[in-house]
Amino acid sequence: MAEGTAQDAFLRIEGVSKSFGSFQAVRDVSLTVGKGEIFSLLGGSGCGKTTLLRMLAGFEEPSAGSIFLDGRDMAGVPPWERPVHMMFQSYAIFPHMTVEENVGYGLKHEKGLSKADRANRVAEMLDLVQLTPFAKRKSHQISGGQRQRVALARALARQPKLLLLDEPLAALDKKLREHTQFELMSIQARTGVTFIVVTHDQEEAMTLSDRIAVMDKGEVRQVGSPTEVYEFPNSRFVAGFIGSINTFEATVIARESPHLCLSVPALGTEVLARDVAVVAVGQAVTLAIRPEKLRISRERPEGANALAGTVRDLAYFGKDSLYRIDLAGGGMVQAHAVNARRGDEGARVADWDDTVFVGFDPASALVLVA
């Protein structure tokens, strides 16, 4: 999908802040979102993501800054006059109505829409979310995933330019949530409506989004594609919030292009990492390595970045295992390994109390300065 720029963005958020008394919920946020993009606001509880969503919907007015939607300044525009629909976490499906009545509820008072046109729009939405066979059923006669699709169809029926989704999949179990993520992506692609998704679930944001804004304490810490925020986080906070990561205090002791040589006291040795132009020799940094980037072996691997250690704990997840390894230098790392072989202990690369080596490619090591 198209990425918004300051000049052509479908949605522009410029220096927006929101205070409730002395508490500042959103701090000087500026974002651009392109037309037809799925854009996620990702963060923990209290980070300001829902407050920002409510300002987009018109339920809250910014204390400072401006919001432009499709070139129009939204200042003073009430919710019912905005080309925006909001889908809440609870779905708010009316239990006394059928599926088709729920979907068509918002169309009853739409000007210029005849009864026949309304029926056609409802039929079109039911077909879009694959609920035509369930049109006459009440909400208690369909599943949680189907209720979620009813809420989505109702939100899209009024043909909004922007759809705001507040934790849309939080009420679903894991398997249904994973399945529904792909349904949402398919429906969005067919309608072309711009989606803004609020979520605390990193996997959900990574799966759904064209781009993600990671928020903390009312501020946007990083904006980028799922690959960018995962593989190239710009701070220790983002690196730790998106997935699991091992972090160590380090010092740059040499630049050996294309690598940096780092002294890492917790590892008891020097290691090589990908060069980062913004750091200087002698600078204190953070070395960060994702668990899946580490390789566990019984024999010492060739090359740099080979660390000896002992397996102190492991968790078996079926397709892979997570190992906690105490290193000879005094530190500890977590490492993921795929269980490629079939069997009991034979499926794992190591067991409790085994002496192992942990290695990693210098290109897989992140050097963070914030």
Regions found by a protein language model. Give the residues of each.
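ABC ATPase nucleotide-binding domains
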Residues: 38, 79-240
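The feature captures the beta-strand-to-loop junction immediately N-terminal to the Walker
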Residues: 42-44
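ABC ATPase nucleotide-binding domain helices that frame the ATP-binding cleft
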Residues: 50-53, 150
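Helix-to-loop junction immediately C-terminal to a conserved catalytic motif
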Residues: 57
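Conserved ABC transporter NBD signature motif
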Residues: 65-73
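Non-catalytic connector elements of ABC transporters
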Residues: 245, 255-370
